[in-house]
Curated annotation (Swiss-Prot):
Gene3D superfamilies given in the database record: Arf Nucleotide-binding Site Opener,domain 2 (1.10.1000.11), Pleckstrin-homology domain (PH domain)/Phosphotyrosine-binding domain (PTB) (2.30.29.30)
Any GO CC annotation of this UniProt entry: ruffle membrane
UniProt feature, compositional bias: Acidic residues: 161-177
GO biological process: regulation of ARF protein signal transduction
Residues found modified as Phosphoserine: 85, 88, 97, 381, 435, 968, 971
Protein name stated in the entry: PH and SEC7 domain-containing protein 4
Domain SEC7: from-to ranges: 493-686
Cell membrane is among the record's keywords: yes
Function: Guanine nucleotide exchange factor for ARF6 and ARL14/ARF7. Through ARL14 activation, controls the movement of MHC class II-containing vesicles along the actin cytoskeleton in dendritic cells. Involved in membrane recycling. Interacts with several phosphatidylinositol phosphate species, including phosphatidylinositol 3,4-bisphosphate, phosphatidylinositol 3,5-bisphosphate and phosphatidylinositol 4,5-bisphosphate.
Amino acid sequence: MMGDHLRPMECLNICLEDNLQPCPEAYPSEIHGHPGPSEPCQEHTCPFDPPESARPDAPHGNSGVESTHLENCLVQVQARQASASLRSLEDNSSLGSPQQNQSSSTQVVFWAGILQAQMCVLDLEEELEKTEGLRAELRCCIPPPSKDLLGDEGLSPSRPEEDEDSGDDSSGPEEENQTWPREKIPGSSLEWGAEEDSIFFDNPLFLESPCSDTSTEGECFSWGYPNSHPDMKTWHQSPQTLDSPLQKGTGLWRQENELDLGSDTADHGGCSTPPFPVPSYKMHPCLALGSTEGDPTVPPDQEGETSCEDDLGHGSPKAPFVDHELIQESDNFEFDLRPATTHPVQPWGSQTSQSLSDLTQPILEDLQREDPSRSQETLISQNRGERDAGCFQEPVFCTLAPWGSQTSLLEPNCPESEGRGSGPQPSPVSSQDSSPRVLLHSPKWPQDASHLLQKDRSELSSLKEEETEEVPSLRQEAECEDTSRSEDASANQHHVHLASAEGLPESPMPQAQSPEEGWRPSSSREKLANDIRNDKGAWNLALRLYQLNGFRKSEVAAHLRKNNDFSRAVAEAYLSFFQFEGQSLDRALRGFLQALVLSGETQERERILYQFSKRFHYCNPGAFPSVDSVHTLTCAIMLLNTDLHGQNIGKSMSCQEFVTNLNGLQDGRNFPKELLKALYWSIRSEKLEWAIDEEDADRPEKDQPSPSAGKISSPFLQMAQDPTMPTYKQGILARKMHHIADGKKTPWGKRGWKMFHTLLRGMVLYFLKGEGQWLDGESLVGHMVDEPVGVHHSLASPATHYTKKPHVFQLRTADWRLYLFQAPTAKEMASWIARINLAAATHSAPPFPAAVGSQRRFVRPILPMSPVQSSLEEQHRSHENCLDAASDDLLDLQRNLPERRGRSRELEEYRLRKEYLEHEKTRYETYVQLLVARLHFPLGDLALWEDQLGKETDGSQEPRPSLKKSHSSPSLHQEEAPTTAKVKRNISERRTYRKIIPKRNRNQL
């Protein structure tokens, strides 16, 4: 058994060292005692070592021993090549694939050697994976590698995790067959053993995949070769079984990559002489380029350096270092190689990395210029000197989709979607039928492929940053788009080919567009600076805006008013959905303003109105001579609506002014006067209504912002929308404004009496038109004819000083305005007084603290107008505290009278302060009295409360026995005594009640 293993090793070492090449004319029938055509090599492996002369530290005394097996080895290799070539011819003829260069016998011999070598390396891979004990023994025998060999990450120590995985399928008999010591093998050395150990034991391609499932045999793809191979005996007879030795024979490409990588790059760079002959192995150019993908030192433009590196000779210590580094970098790529007669479309294009195409593009262009038909060949060279002559398939950009699925055939990168020159191409049906032969797949491979792809990409990302920084991001983007497509491969084959061929020089990842995305720009860079897109996108957005699909009415104008071509296209498409045929301009404008909320700046609104004018002129071409005339009149209508119904103060625009302002604006002529008058009275009688969102219309009234009532703008309008505010009283009242704010006299033109239907709701008096009864919670917007009046912190009392009209009461507001109201009867007057004061006492918030400063001028404080949320008890306590404070302030003021000879300003300040404090004291006294009466009837009717209040008032007005002032002061006349509250007075206060007053102070106090 030991001899069987030593003879192939010795044979290869002799061949590699002496540069001997076999003669292709001999055809022995057996190798190592196994029948060639029927039984694959499963037990005997042939590891191929690099020549001893290729290492500077190799011994030089082994040539005599190795030459003893030279003749036998050459005969065996030639025999296997002959048998494999015969089987290849039979398979090609049975599959019916096109035959290229059929008369070339050297080509047949070459392919036979390739296939037979694959079988040998597969056997070697299986035996090495199953023999964990052998590896442990070998590691013990191998000394540590030198530092020059470990200077790069390519020569890394073995990983124990992979060793454990690879040792799961080991068997006892096979371990015994291969437990020969490495030192006893002729032609080998410790240095080569370390390198072999790193290649075969640490290389993940020779171990089981970490994502594969080894529990079920034959269902999951494995990096190792299975224990049993029932189909390998007849693999040359079936097109399906032909894939097994090729798909799983990844070890062949790894071994050859280690042996021949330096010469491959040299061959591409222009050197056609191989460093040493290996007759039965041929490296594919894509693998050579793929292996150098991650290495920035061997790009296509630096192939000359690699050639010079090979020319240094095999004695250079750099050769094994570079080869091993490239092998480690190429561990993430696999290729499925078949004879050219089986598939004219080569399968490895779908698995080649994106950067492979970038590296090989200059080579492809040169090869295509020499012979376009070479793009169909599948590497038909018979020796290394012919590698530049044979043209491999043009690598296409690709990303790995789940293998074995139809999705992978739909990619723009798939080889079956690419044109292959003038050679025959398979039909769409045959392309789909042959997909199992094109792609390496198994029932559980899709998950493993995605996992390994991510792992490989992460390992190569650090090596690609200097050359291809954008490749990983584009590859990920392509993967996201590629996995979402599931269209028919036959329908997209020609289209994808064109997209891939045209996009090659510009984008590293051209994508096939779906029919839904055909109108969209292929990349964001194709958009202009002002976001121009095509008409299809503008029309789709306009349709969504018109149908309010995902938009509200208040959001439509934002997409129509921008100053760019796309926004104008959207606005034009949006207006195309409106039909204005036979409508007047004001009617069309009203309908348009009901569809959207016209918002934005003046120039933004003008852009939207211009699109409206274009559409109106298109629908009514005979109404106006041009679009500009329609646009001018539309803007004039908008300004007229603002002037007549806006919040402006002053005289409104008349019809004559409206006509005069538009003179000469209809393309140099005047608009018809009848048209302008009709538009004026239409807007004056009915203002333009603005659209509101449906959400705002459905929510409660208190949440809605209240629109303005005519020219009035008052914060009390918001209180009119609150349905929680109770209605205290309503009826007909005549009103007269006696003083405006701050107690100033009302101008002459505004002193007249006016009749209103007055409504007291909450703490606001509303003056409405009509005499109907208003219910609680009913909206008052649109029915008010004058500004509402707030009664917070106000006091209503009978107007005893006014004698011109009966039943008149006065209302002093918080801003010191004074209103006179006339009620129909005295009872109505008393009811209005009581209920206004009750509303003020219930809803008036406590005043803010007084300001602190050095200014001695008296200024009335500003009282809060927001309604309070406190209960009646809390309000009662608050008003009592305010009453005590006002009483104390008034007492302090009376104790500190100004000097008799003081200036007039000081006396005026004293008068204003005293008047204010007396009013505040009276107001809080009234509030406390009303709240006490209200607390007795918290839930009762206000009519019962009024009756009880009236009884208390009548009882308080009855005369009570008391001393008259004339008794204490006989000199004072009883009729001239002032009616003031009895308080404790000092001497200075008695001066105001004496009849004899100094002349200088009579008119000032």
